[in-house]
Amino acid sequence: MTERCDVVLIGGGAAGLMCARVAGRRGRSVLILDHAKRPAEKIRISGGGRCNFTNMHSSPAAFLSNNRHFCKSAFTRYTQDDFVQLVTEHQIAFHEKKLGQLFCDDSAQQIIGCDTTYIYTVSYTHLRAHETKANLVCRLLL
């Protein structure tokens, strides 16, 4: 396990990898802690292995939350079009199935690779809930 890193992420799924991608682009070393043996397991099998990576018809109105403005902020900061642009920049071919669902033409592995391209130093550790591998100290909570 990495003894010192800039960012510790709990969860190696889609959101965790996206956070790791952003941190990597900013030159940060990243440690991802997850229960799965490999990161992105659910991404790898989603959409029959082709990854339903976004829905062009998603909107804040489709989400329920105690804070009804949260989704507005999230959708304003990063839209479906932003993710489609990322996929296009990585030359990943995709198609629309029904109701705005976008899938890779080939494999979900392409999306996983797209997320990890900018992670400069990644350490992935498989942890079960009852294991303790190290003492983690958080210096800054955002």
Question: Where do the protein language model's features map onto the residues?
Answer:
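N-terminal Rossmann-like FAD-binding beta1-loop-alpha1 element of flavoenzymes
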Residues: 7-31
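Hydrophobic alpha-helical segments, chiefly the membrane-spanning helices
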Residues: 136-142
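Short, hinge-like loop/turn segments at secondary-structure boundaries
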Residues: 47-52, 113
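Conserved small/polar residues in nucleotide/adenosyl-binding loops
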Residues: 125-132
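Glycine-rich active-site loop/strand segments that organize a redox cofactor
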Residues: 50-95
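Short beta-strand to alpha-helix junction loop
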Residues: 72-78, 98-116
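Glycine-rich FAD pyrophosphate-binding loop
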Residues: 25-44
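Short helix-loop-beta connector
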Residues: 2-4
